[in-house]
């Protein structure tokens, strides 16, 4: 065990406020334990980042939470490695090792608070009013008349029920997949339709089918109320219902680590090729407001 240095010279005169608990007593092999704690924090932090996937952007509130969690991991490892929870004499040592993480947490909290206050609607109403530019126009010229036979007669809930029935056409794999919540109404070949992606039935069916990907998608005609299953020559390998590296937002995060992403939507082009549309957003008022 490393030697304990205690001042008996009187230079550190007792002012009535210090006690035995204020004597800094490092645990045995403290240097080695610090190195191990740092390495474990980096490893656990990497795992945490993999699952949280925060944008490396000060406008992302998830980034602040991620850094706070990493600091808390280091503090917890310091307490465990020093055994301060059963040996109170090591508490001053833990407090000393906690200074930098503690200061970092307070600094991030201050930055986040100021960033939030500078974006509060009450203080920045004028800025919010300028988010959308207003342009004058002529309704009769800007909005063309449409054929009433092209007016959608289904709502999203009814269209999803038709999609669930249409999934039965995937007879060879119908038990492996379900209709996903990702559906979008678009104009496809001048016809209003709702396109719906598939999802894996459960984790075991994902394990069985993830290599081939999602084999099809469904089109529901919003005027004729007919559903069509469209098989793909190659399955969709990335989607919001995937896991690990094929999870859509994780795949995008590793390619674009600083971007702020909005919710993805599923669409197809005029040739029927499927796409995931993921908007990139920016915060223009304060740190977290004015999307």
Task: Describe the predicted segments one by one.
Residues 2-291:
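Soluble extracytoplasmic regions of secretory-pathway and membrane proteins
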């Amino acid at each position: 065990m490393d030697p304990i240095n205690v001042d008996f010279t009187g230079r550190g005169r007792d002012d009535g406020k210090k006690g035995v608990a204020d004597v800094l007593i490092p645990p045995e092999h403290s240097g080695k334990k610090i190195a191990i704690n740092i390495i474990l924090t980096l490893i656990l932090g990497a795992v945490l980042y993999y699952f949280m996937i925060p944008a490396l952007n000060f406008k992302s509130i998830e980034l602040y939470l991620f850094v706070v969690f990493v600091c808390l991991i280091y503090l917890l490892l310091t307490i465990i490695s020093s055994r301060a929870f059963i040996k109170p004499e090591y508490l001053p040592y833990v407090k000393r090792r906690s200074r930098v993480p503690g200061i970092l947490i307070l600094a991030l909290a201050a930055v986040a608070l100021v960033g939030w206050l500078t974006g509060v609607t009450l203080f920045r109403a004028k800025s919010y009013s300028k988010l959308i530019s207003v342009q004058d126009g002529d309704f009769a010229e800007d909005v063309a008349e449409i054929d009433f036979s092209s007016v959608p007669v289904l709502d999203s809930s009814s269209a999803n029920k038709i999609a669930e029935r249409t999934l039965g056409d995937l007879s060879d794999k119908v038990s492996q997949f379900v209709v996903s919540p990702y559906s979008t109404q678009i104009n496809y070949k001048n016809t209003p339709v709702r396109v719906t992606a598939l999802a894996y039935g459960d984790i075991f069916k994902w394990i069985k089918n993830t290599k081939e990907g999602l084999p099809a998608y469904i089109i529901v005609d919003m005027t004729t109320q007919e559903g069509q299953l469209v098989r793909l020559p190659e399955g969709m390998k990335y989607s919001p219902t995937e896991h690990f590296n094929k999870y859509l937002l994780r795949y995008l995060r590793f390619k674009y680590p600083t971007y702020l992403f909005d919710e993805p939507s599923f669409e197809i082009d005029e040739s029927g090729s499927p796409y995931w549309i993921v908007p990139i957003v920016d915060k223009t008022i304060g740190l977290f407001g004015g999307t």
